[in-house]
Design a protein with these regions (language model features):
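Residue patterns forming the tRNA-binding/recognition surfaces of aminoacyl-tRNA synthetases
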Residues: 1-31, 49-51, 95-97, 107-108, ...
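Protease-associated
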Residues: 34, 43-132, 141-145
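Electropositive, beta-rich accessory/interaction domains or terminal extensions
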Residues: 37-39
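Intrinsically disordered, low-complexity segments enriched in small/polar residues
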Residues: 41-44, 210
């Protein structure tokens, strides 16, 4: 399922105006925390002039889209005629504010009543979509990296359980599954789409055949969740090192010690094994100790 979603602006010179995003994962919309644009993409404000009878947009609505992608977006939304009324410079986004599509959803208990920041990011392209990317840092690595470098990790949500169901505390969607126990699509995606229609924030919907990650063990589809883990920082300097002690002279970090030990403390048979292990440790990120596995959680003691 693919959807085009309106994020209403709450502070700009136009009334009834929204930024439009496109996503293939409707279930991530409840966890949205930002909208991203690219300063190298040209944008415009478009007014809907005429539509087909079955269309979720209304005449007179204003939408901000990438100029290169606007025509295809309106085609998907069954808009017969739209005109560009203004170009948007990327610096203009610094003055814009938007809100979550579910901010006024009945029964939401103000769960989504927060300002959604508009941020600049190079992950946004003009290849497909709208020229904007909806950011759910709890469910996407690139989204997470954008929040990490801004020091925004406190904004992360944990709305999805290990079994792919929304947490019970979430209004409206609590308990709904993204995928069921048989690996088939659950009710979450469709319910999110229906609520977007209810709050008049769905521009269009469609279907797209694309690759999707699956478990190599069970062959079931996967979802991405940001969860708390224990890590070993392999590049952090180890304290209280007595450099006079020969046993502690292999380096000041775990990585340095491991690499030096490979060459000075280990005899290799065959020697090709040394290169494989050395290159792996030389480039590996911090070591996650608590990585969940099907058969258990190994922890170093």
């Amino acid at each position: 399922k693919t959807i085009w979603v309106k994020f209403p602006l709450i502070s700009n010179e136009f009334n009834n105006c929204a930024i439009v995003i496109w996503t293939t994962t409707p279930w991530t919309i409840p966890s949205n925390k930002a909208v991203a644009f690219n300063k190298d993409v040209s944008y415009g404000v478009y007014e809907v002039i005429d539509t087909e009878s079955e269309c979720w947009l209304s005449k007179g609505e204003l939408l901000i889209l990438a100029n290169k992608l606007a025509s295809e977006c309106f085609k998907q939304a069954r808009v017969l005629n739209a005109k560009k009324i203004k170009n948007i410079h990327f610096k203009d986004f610094n003055t814009f504010k938007t809100k979550h599509p579910f901010s006024n959803l009945a029964g939401s208990n103000e769960f989504w009543n927060y300002e959604v920041p508009i941020i600049e990011s190079s992950i946004v392209t003009e290849e497909t979509g709208t020229g904007f990317v909806h950011m759910a840092p709890s469910h996407g690595a690139e989204d997470y990296e954008e929040f990490l470098k801004r020091g925004w990790l406190e904004k992360l949500t944990h709305n999805v359980n290990e079994d792919s169901s929304f947490v019970k505390m979430m209004p409206i969607f609590g308990g709904l599954e993204i995928f069921n126990k048989k690996g088939k699509e659950g009710k979450a995606n469709e319910e999110v789409i229906q609520k977007l229609i209810e709050v008049n924030c769905l521009m269009a919907r469609g279907r797209l055949n694309h690759s999707y990650p699956h478990s190599w063990r069970s062959k079931a589809p996967l979802i991405f969740r940001n969860t708390k883990q224990w890590f070993v920082s392999i590049d952090k300097e180890i304290s209280n090192i007595d450099n006079s002690d020969q046993k502690l002279s292999y380096g000041n970090t775990i990585r340095e010690r491991a690499l030096k030990s490979i060459d000075e403390l280990v005899s290799w048979f065959p020697k090709s094994g040394r290169n494989r292990l050395f290159s792996m440790i030389e480039t590996r990120p911090d070591w996650v100790l608590s990585r969940q596995r099907v058969w258990g959680v190994p922890l170093a003691c």
